């Protein structure tokens, strides 16, 4: 592997990168990307560069992204009033439709930018390669849930094919409907249930 052609010139030295690769080559990195990173062009470009390098040096990773500010913008544009209960957004049938739209737009943007750098990625969402089965959180919150099961085999198959799954914090309930999850909760559940060895 010609690391000097992969690592940015202002990045760490090659000896340090080789140590990092040797240490973590048998593990899976679970990366949380918050909505603030996605809205800041400089941070977003750095995030894309980092994920691309991780893929090209042969490390395995999963990216879970949020999008709270993008969701708020989408709801405001459509005059949807937001209510919160204990810090969680109440999501009725109309609200969840716009939440899904905002998150899928973000997911598509991340995929597009990574593919433009020849990074091997795939989308994980209720519409494409769904792996998350949901339990509703409460009737009060509407379409808000937590993971019931996560399809470990499906995720590992993507990773074995040298792909980085880009995961939307959405899943399907037993009723076939889409639910939103807390991003951090999803990250923790991926670590506990899906991966043999993870770090972040």
How should each PLM-predicted stretch be described?
Residues 1-200:
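Nucleotide/pyrophosphate-binding catalytic subdomain
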């Amino acid at each position: 592997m010609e690391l000097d052609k992969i690592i940015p010139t202002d990045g760490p030295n090659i000896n340090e990168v080789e140590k990092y690769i040797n240490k973590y080559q048998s593990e899976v990195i679970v990366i949380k990307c918050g909505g603030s990173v996605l809205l800041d062009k400089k941070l977003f470009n750095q995030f894309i560069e980092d994920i691309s390098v991780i893929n090209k040096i042969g490390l395995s990773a999963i990216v879970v992204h949020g999008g709270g500010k993008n969701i708020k913008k989408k709801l405001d544009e459509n005059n949807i009033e937001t209510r919160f209960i204990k810090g969680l957004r109440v999501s009725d049938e109309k609200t969840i439709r716009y939440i899904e739209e905002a998150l899928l737009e973000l997911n598509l943007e991340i995929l597009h930018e990574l593919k433009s750098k020849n990074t091997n990625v795939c989308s994980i969402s209720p519409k494409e390669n769904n792996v998350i089965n949901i339990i509703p959180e409460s009737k009060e919150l509407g379409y808000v849930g937590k993971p019931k099961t996560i399809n470990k085999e499906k995720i590992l198959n993507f990773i074995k094919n040298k792909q980085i799954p880009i995961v939307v914090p959405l899943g399907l309930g037993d009723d076939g409907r889409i639910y939103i999850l807390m991003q951090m909760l999803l990250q923790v559940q991926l670590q506990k249930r899906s991966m043999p060895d993870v770090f972040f």
